[in-house]
Amino acid sequence: MNRIFKSIWCEQTRTWVAASEHAVARGGRASSVVASAGGLEKVLKLSILGAASLIAMGVVGPFAEEAMAANNAGVCLTYNGSSNNTSGTGGWFADGCKSAGWVQGMVTNSKTDWVGLTADDTQIVLDGSAGSIYFRTGGINGNVLTMSNATGGVLLSGLAAGVNPTDAVNMSQLTSLSTSTATGITSLSTSTATSIASLSTSMLSLGVGVVTQDASSGAISVGANSPGLTVDFAGGQGPRTLTGVAAGVNATDAVNVGQLASLSTSTAAGLSTAASGVASLSTSLLGAAGDLASLSTSASTGLATADSGIASLSTSLLGTADNVTSLSTSLSTVNANLAGLQTSVDNVVSYDDPSKSAITLGGAGVATPVLLTNVAAGKIAATSTDAVNGSQLYTLQQEFSQQYDLLTSQVSSLSTSVSGLQGSVSANTGTASGDNSTASGDNATASGTNSTANGTNSTASGDNSTASGTNASASGENSTATGTDSTASGSNSTANGTNSTASGDNSTASGTNASATGENSTATGTDSTASGSNSTANGTNSTASGDSSTASGTNASATGENSTATGTDSTASGSNSTANGTNSTASGDNSTASGTNASATGENSTATGTDSTASGSNSTANGTNSTASGDNSTASGTNASATGENSTATGTDSTASGSNSTANGANSTASGENSTATGTDSTASGSNSTANGTNSTASGDNSTASGTNASATGENSTATGTASTASGSNSTANGANSTASGAGATATGENAAATGAGATATGNNASASGTSSTAGGANAIASGENSTANGANSTASGNGSSAFGESAAAAGDGSTALGANAVASGVGSVATGAGSVASGANSSAYGTGSNATGAGSVAIGQGATASGSNSVALGTGSVASEDNTVSVGSAGSERRITNVAAGVNATDAVNVGQLNSAVSGIRNQMDGMQGQIDTLARDAYSGIAAATALTMIPDVDPGKTLAVGIGTANFKGYQASALGATARITQNLKVKTGVSYSGSNYVWGAGMSYQW
């Protein structure tokens, strides 16, 4: 019979075991069963029998088929050193527990508590003593362990971080890999922009992530220092592939190859988690400092070296696609960055070799020299390693020429003096009165301690001073004056050149007529002047009068505090200003002018480019002939102009003249306050207007034009789309060639036109020309005032008319056409239904093909026709052709009217119920009347019979006085009897009387006659 088992928890062994479905826990009713160690053997037998049953039924995953096909299969279990096995092929192994074939190296005879399941060489072992699970696959099918279900892989969760090279990794390790890789790649990109040397360091940092490679063995390890238990999938034939793994979701889940399917071969080659691959790339990049042209080849070699490491990594990691999206993205970024790096390398200036001792412009071995331009003036000092520019060399040449001439003169004078000495020593009339002083030359005077005066009329009065040259004077302590008429009066000052002057402490004046009067000032060049404290003037006729100012270049002038003027005729007069370029001017405080004729006159202004001008406060002009005159304005581009306050002009010939305006694009113009013009030839002239698109125009206040040739001229208008036009106030045109010319009009769709005030046209070629009209749908037309046309090709031409549906037409004033091809041409008419027609005034047609032609007529129903005036046709095919009639059918197609309420008023219709009730009442009345008639007839018949009976009584004969008689009669079955008497009173007077009886009625009568 069938046996059903369930899993229970064994407290003794701390494992799950199989038990009978009827087993219960200690304590009676419970949801679990606890097995004791004493009954473990029986329970394990049941477990293994259950497992064997599952294998036989093919429900234990991929092992079922293998077990059924195996030549020798069985199970073994041991507990406390004892084993229990049965023998037989396909059953229990008699010697299975001692077989050497059990997961070699994993289970030995010394193991005391373990359960084994085997089918040929394919085995599963639960090692209780070690707390491990072992898998082994046979040699026939390869070293593959597959986990799957009916629909795909199986999720392997609770996976500890892998340690050894053949360990599986979990999601957390892969996420760490992705993060560290992305970080390394980002570092690569940043380092490339900074320098090639920092790129090497950033790439090396990639190796410290979760995936590393041993430089000597090339082995790859994943999370080598990660703690946790071990799941070992190795077998007798070495490491094996783990297959059938579902896509990992949680942090500790294993990942499968499917999740890495999106990583292309080039991407895999681009990722080098191996330290040797990264080292190769790093070495190549370092070598690129000497010859960057080889970077591409070296990088390719380094990446190719890492390819084998990636293949191993792919095998170990078992891949992922969904959960390493960021890794794939990062690698794509690497490819892009490397491509950009190669492009950048072609123009990089690099060292000739790794020693970084030489740089050859143009590349090592290139014979053609390279021009180095725009070199700033280098610092001239004993310890300076700065490069000097042509201007400094020119000044040096001039000084050298002057000094050479002076030296020639002095040598000539010295020669003459020496010749004079040979004749007479008395020719030297110099005076050296200072301690250790020296005076050489006519009237030379050295009065300072350790001073030296060398030259005619030279004077060295300062301690440790030196005066060399005719009329040279060094009066400052530690001062030096070299050159004819040179003067060094400041402490530690130096004057070098004809008529040069260094009066400031620690000042230096070099060049003919050079003057350094400020403290710590430096003047270099003919007629150069440095009068400000810590100022520097470098160049012919250069002037640095501001404190901490610098003037470099012929006629350069830096008069502002902390100002810098660089270039011929450059001027920096503002505090903290900078002028860089020929004839550049920076007069505003904190201003910067860069470029020939550049001018920055506004406070905090910046002018960059030839003839650029920034005159507004905080303004910026960037580009040839650009102008930024408004406060906080910005002009970028050739001939760009930003004259409005807070305005921005970007692009060639762009103009932003309005306050807070923005012009972006060649020839763009933003003249309105708070206006924005974006796009070539765009214009935004209205206040708060916006023009976005080539040749777009927004001239109305608060208007917006978006699209090529779009135009918004109306106040608060909006035009969106190519060639769209919104000219009406508060109008909106949306769509190519759309037009909204009416005030408050809206046109939406290609070629849509809303020309009426408050009109709305929606749909391609839709037109709304009437005031407050609405046209919706392709080719819809609403020309009447307050008209509505909704539907393709619909038309509403009457005032207050409405047409809804394709090709619907409402021509009459106040008319309504609803339905495809519906026509309402009569005034106040309504046509509802496809093909319905309401042509009569105030007529209504409801239903497909219905027709109401009579004035005030109503046709309801498919094909219904109401042609009579005030007629009504109700129902499909009904015809009302007569005036003031209601028809519910047609000739031959009459129909009943059902569910009619009982009429109340005199003109109400009555229903059959009311009619039946009336007929019944009349019938009852008729019945009553008939009874009365019958009674009357009976009475009449009786009366006739009674009267007849009276007449039948004979009269009194002549000559007789009295006659008494009886009579009888019958009329229509009614019998009567009569008694009468006649008396002759006189000859001339006669009396007659009688009574008659018929049924229940009596008739009597009397009479008298007089005869003569």
From Swiss-Prot:
Low complexity: bias regions: 443-504, 520-588, 604-630, 646-700, 708-746
Induction: Expressed in vivo during the course of aerosol infection. Expressed at very low levels under routine laboratory growth conditions.
Main location: other
Residue ranges, annotated region (Translocator domain): 960-1012
Position of the signal peptide: 1-71
Gene Ontology CC: cell outer membrane; cell surface
Start and end residues of each stretch annotated as Disordered: 420-746, 785-809
Residue ranges that the Swiss-Prot or TrEMBL entry lists as coiled coil: none
GO BP, sorted A to Z: cell adhesion; protein transport
Stretches with biased composition (Polar residues): 427-442, 505-519, 589-603, 631-645
Function: Involved in virulence. Mediates adherence to human respiratory epithelial cells.
Protein family per UniProt: Belongs to the autotransporter-2 (AT-2) (TC 1.B.40) family.
Assembly description: Homotrimer.
Identification of the protein by name: Autotransporter adhesin BpaC
Species this protein is from: Burkholderia mallei (strain ATCC 23344)
Protein encoded by which gene: bpaC
